[in-house]
Amino acid sequence: MAIDEISIASFAHRFDNKLDLIDVREVDEYESGHVSGAVNIPLSEFVGRLNEIPKTTVFFICRSGSRSMQACEICVDAGLTSVINVAGGTMGWIAAGREVVLGGQPE
């Protein structure tokens, strides 16, 4: 099954903090700047935390789009098929002039 990808421009157009967005970078990367509302589940912990992935459409983001694609593939292999990779990742988000927030998980 092919994994859906969304461009930074299209994602920014759809983004509203109500989307399920998971950032799969490591904790220190996440805390140094992430898309507002993104929940951090590092790829290194991902398989053990699959039960935390919502059953709705979920967007995945990382630094550039590579690790988030791996997370999407893991989800598909586990039967979670409504996953979308944010191509370009957080670097693309920042390059597009979008804001990031610092610190830990959203409340």
Where are these regions (language model features)?
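Rhodanese-like catalytic fold shared by cysteine-dependent sulfurtransferases
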Residues: M1-D20, V27-T57, R67-E107
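Short, surface-exposed ligand- or partner-binding patches at beta-edge/loop junctions that are enriched
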Residues: I61
